[in-house]
């Protein structure tokens, strides 16, 4: 029977499927961080258990770490407790830890792939909703809750219902300057923030195949923002080229065998999806959100929506509420919207390709008066590479702040947060009310769009001179 990519990975990981019950699937990689793991480790201790497969568990510190200092003294009391607790738990249970002093420390969804921990055909879980990022490699990756984190620690398995399948095809090629972030925001704009609910989405089409691994990770990262359980892209030569030689990638004869196996990880001809969506790549312009969820998005040359144009009262009410919160007027040109904060970073857009794209717009320019802009590399390796290329100097010469790796301003959990009334051009993944700080307004954009907004002081169409 013809199978989709998701069905192939799922079927190969089902341990047992009792009649009338959710199947139990095997987990190949378990990623943990300081925020969602303490209670799970405690549960394992109380039960008198050990970790089932500590060698398949990888930990880092990212959500609550400081991006201005690697010292524990820079952390709040709560953050310090979380960081120190993770260190103690990893030592006690034999888990590999990339702490704040490790050269490879970084955002879990950045450092996992760059170390080769993420591999095609595997099942990967983490106590973080953006675990879908790893699906860019043809892995089945999704976020889990703290009780499930404990279950995986104890058994290396998870009870899961099988999801429905959705194909999202982006046909043709994008215009010059259009990025993976624009593609995925356009997708969410088309199907809505709940259009993928109940599905595992496979992204395909010429525009997806043309993306680098960094770009594919951006797309899969935001699968959760369309409501999907996970997002996947079939592995190909681009995938193998990225993974070859990385620390945890197969070596020698095992590498050849792995690549041969990965070549089979594609949806069979004739496989049937439960739902399908098609976009024409050439129609995608630079995107940015205007409201309070990722589905409230428009192209840079479009206007802030008018509630009176809504198709029903529910949509009208949603638009009205969002406009009130973000303090925008219907009919406003997005290029007339000013910003005072810029954040370039997060597990969506903090890789070397993202920083290079942003640096193009920062080079030889200055951050506009009244704007604070920070650049936060996603990992120690990204930071090292960027500095070797001189990107840090381009940013600092332009007036951007160059920071240490971490989740930073993506969420109002650490010291990098917005104040009430701030309006931020952000390369992160969520623009919910208060996401970056109580009373703050977030506009999701690509790294290039964020850097351009920083120097202009307002959103600009990067396809035109500014």
Curated annotation (Swiss-Prot):
<dbReference type="InterPro" id="IPR004430">
    <property type="entry name" value="3-IsopropMal_deHydase_lsu"/>
</dbReference>
<dbReference type="GO" id="GO:0009098">
    <property type="term" value="P:L-leucine biosynthetic process"/>
</dbReference>
<dbReference type="GO" id="GO:0046872">
    <property type="term" value="F:metal ion binding"/>
</dbReference>
<keyword id="KW-0479">Metal-binding</keyword>
<protein>
    <recommendedName>
        <fullName>3-isopropylmalate dehydratase large subunit</fullName>
        <ecNumber>4.2.1.33</ecNumber>
    </recommendedName>
</protein>
<dbReference type="GO" id="GO:0003861">
    <property type="term" value="F:3-isopropylmalate dehydratase activity"/>
</dbReference>
<keyword id="KW-0456">Lyase</keyword>
<keyword id="KW-0411">Iron-sulfur</keyword>
<feature type="binding site">
    <location>
        <position position="347"/>
    </location>
    <ligand>
        <name>[4Fe-4S] cluster</name>
    </ligand>
</feature>
<keyword id="KW-0028">Amino-acid biosynthesis</keyword>
<dbReference type="InterPro" id="IPR018136">
    <property type="entry name" value="Aconitase_4Fe-4S_BS"/>
</dbReference>
<comment type="similarity">
    <text>Belongs to the aconitase/IPM isomerase family. LeuC type 1 subfamily.</text>
</comment>
<keyword id="KW-0432">Leucine biosynthesis</keyword>
<feature type="binding site">
    <location>
        <position position="407"/>
    </location>
    <ligand>
        <name>[4Fe-4S] cluster</name>
    </ligand>
</feature>
<feature type="binding site">
    <location>
        <position position="410"/>
    </location>
    <ligand>
        <name>[4Fe-4S] cluster</name>
    </ligand>
</feature>
<comment type="subunit">
    <text>Heterodimer of LeuC and LeuD.</text>
</comment>
<dbReference type="InterPro" id="IPR001030">
    <property type="entry name" value="Acoase/IPM_deHydtase_lsu_aba"/>
</dbReference>
<keyword id="KW-0100">Branched-chain amino acid biosynthesis</keyword>
<dbReference type="Pfam" id="PF00330">
    <property type="entry name" value="Aconitase"/>
</dbReference>
<comment type="pathway">
    <text>Amino-acid biosynthesis; L-leucine biosynthesis; L-leucine from 3-methyl-2-oxobutanoate: step 2/4.</text>
</comment>
<dbReference type="InterPro" id="IPR015931">
    <property type="entry name" value="Acnase/IPM_dHydase_lsu_aba_1/3"/>
</dbReference>
<dbReference type="InterPro" id="IPR036008">
    <property type="entry name" value="Aconitase_4Fe-4S_dom"/>
</dbReference>
<dbReference type="InterPro" id="IPR050067">
    <property type="entry name" value="IPM_dehydratase_rel_enz"/>
</dbReference>
<keyword id="KW-0408">Iron</keyword>
<keyword id="KW-0004">4Fe-4S</keyword>
<dbReference type="InterPro" id="IPR033941">
    <property type="entry name" value="IPMI_cat"/>
</dbReference>
<comment type="function">
    <text>Catalyzes the isomerization between 2-isopropylmalate and 3-isopropylmalate, via the formation of 2-isopropylmaleate.</text>
</comment>
<dbReference type="GO" id="GO:0051539">
    <property type="term" value="F:4 iron, 4 sulfur cluster binding"/>
</dbReference>
